[in-house]
Design a protein with these regions (language model features):
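Short loop segments at secondary-structure junctions
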Residues: 40, 61-64, 73, 154-160, ...
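Active-site-adjacent beta-strand/loop module that shapes the phosphate/pyrophosphate-binding cleft
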Residues: 31-42, 141-162
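A positional/architectural concept
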Residues: 1-63, 73
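A broad, low-specificity signal marking well-ordered, structured residues that form hydrophobic/aromatic
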Residues: 33, 46, 68, 97, ...
Length: 215
């Protein structure tokens, strides 16, 4: 079954022999913390990670009747399968299918502005905050970091495409066009590693715009 208008790359860009893991004593993105607290006269502790919040946007291109999503290598997913769980039998290579997204790391910019920047950098569409509709805000990794993600939706057209996308600096992001008519089947297919935000945003769209006819 073909879920995509374009064909996703089947070849990993990561050399398995080059991968190694080591303890992390410091990071620009996370801090390891331990909370001490009293709950109903019981002293407790909880280890957690201080991390940045994020934004993500579901892009829907009208002409193609497709959701524009991204595929990229996630080291944590790779390590989970090959180092922590040792379940190499699963069809997981560390690449995940996700919404266009980014960290909230620019104090002088609004969440909407950051979301628009990510749409341009990752997918090549130049949109503005007026294009965005808020889907909602959701906490992720509630037992580990409690980071907050704000989800947006934007209806786009081909004339907003100004570059091929793919990310900036050393990012290797693949832009994919997921057929709206196949989106539910894609969500249910466990052979494709995907994020909760991607599935939630697509389900939100399909419910809100259930009367849209396929192009």
């Amino acid at each position: 079954m073909s879920y995509f208008k374009n064909i996703p790359s089947q070849q990993s860009l990561v050399h398995h022999a080059s991968v190694s893991l080591e303890p992390c004593s410091s990071s620009h993105y996370i801090e390891l913390k331990r909370m001490h607290y009293n709950e109903e006269n019981t002293e407790k502790t909880w280890d957690m990670i201080k991390s940045l919040d994020s934004v993500a946007v579901l892009l829907y291109e009208k002409e193609s009747d497709c959701f524009v999503i991204v595929k990229q290598f996630r080291p944590a997913i790779y390590a989970r399968h090959f180092y922590f769980k040792f379940d190499q039998d699963q069809n997981i290579d560390g690449y995940t299918y996700e919404l266009c997204a980014g960290l909230v790391d620019k104090a002088n910019k609004s969440l909407e502005e950051i979301a628009c920047e990510e749409a341009l950098e990752e997918c090549g569409y130049e949109i503005s905050p007026k294009h965005l509709e808020t889907i909602g805000q959701f906490y992720s990794a509630t037992g580990l970091s409690g980071s907050l993600q704000t989800l947006y939706y934007a209806e786009i057209s081909a004339n907003l495409k100004v570059s091929k996308g793919g990310g900036i600096d050393t990012e290797k992001i693949e832009v994919l066009f997921l057929k709206r008519s196949k989106a539910l089947d894609f969500i249910a297919d466990f052979q494709y590693a995907k994020t909760t935000g991607l599935s939630l945003a697509i389900l939100w769209h399909l419910k809100k715009f259930k009367n849209i006819k396929n192009v």
